[in-house]
Design a protein with these regions (language model features):
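Enzymes that bind and transform nitrogen-containing heteroaromatic metabolites
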Residues: 1-185
């Protein structure tokens, strides 16, 4: 069984608005390494739609992009992508699959079938899966910014405090810190 690893950009005040993160070669290389380590991507519909509107064009070369960003796009194009949605059924992007029915069972089945693990990259979906105790590790890229607005991570709350064990904290040149945690005991 593979691990479910939640990874996202966030500011010091917990904002997960994708426009608030630092998008440079180093941060893209960080996420490319994470994607290389995992066997599949898992997103909610909103994240999928944001991604499908841009990254396939970068992978095809229709949009000019620096080498690190193009590398991310090409690898993402080839990666299996699983989407949780109750409002959309058609996901035409290459290697995209719809998780339907019982969320807990569907995600557990995906973990069981993906020995290299699943990389989860949607904030709202992460909160829901964390309430189900399905997330095994957290690889967060914390940016040196205070956004002062939302959306924020876990704004819908959890039933109790989640205790984590720090595995590593790695500063990047841009001032962001890559934090790696796993669930404690």
């Amino acid at each position: 069984m593979g691990l479910l690893t939640f990874s996202i950009n966030l500011t010091l005040d917990g904002c997960i608005d994708h426009q608030e993160g630092i998008a440079d070669d180093e941060t893209h290389a960080f996420f490319t390494r994470l994607m290389d380590e995992g066997g599949a991507m898992l997103w909610g519909r909103v994240t999928y739609e944001m991604m499908e509107g841009y990254w396939p064009a970068v992978a095809r070369g229709d949009v000019a992009a620096p080498p690190a960003i193009r590398e991310w796009a090409v690898k993402l194009e080839a990666k299996p992508k699983y989407v949780v949605s109750s409002t959309r059924e058609d996901f035409p992007w290459t290697h995209s699959h719809h998780i339907t029915g019982d969320l807990r069972a569907g995600v557990q089945k995906l973990k069981d079938a993906t020995p290299n693990g699943v990389l989860l990259g949607s904030g709202k979906l992460a909160a829901e899966l964390d309430r189900m105790d399905l997330i095994d590790e957290y690889k967060l890229l914390v940016h040196p910014r205070i956004a002062g607005h939302g959306p924020t991570l876990y704004e819908s709350g959890l039933p109790s405090t989640r205790r984590l064990e720090l595995i590593s904290a790695t500063p990047l040149r841009c001032g962001a810190v890559a934090m790696h945690y796993r669930r404690a005991g």
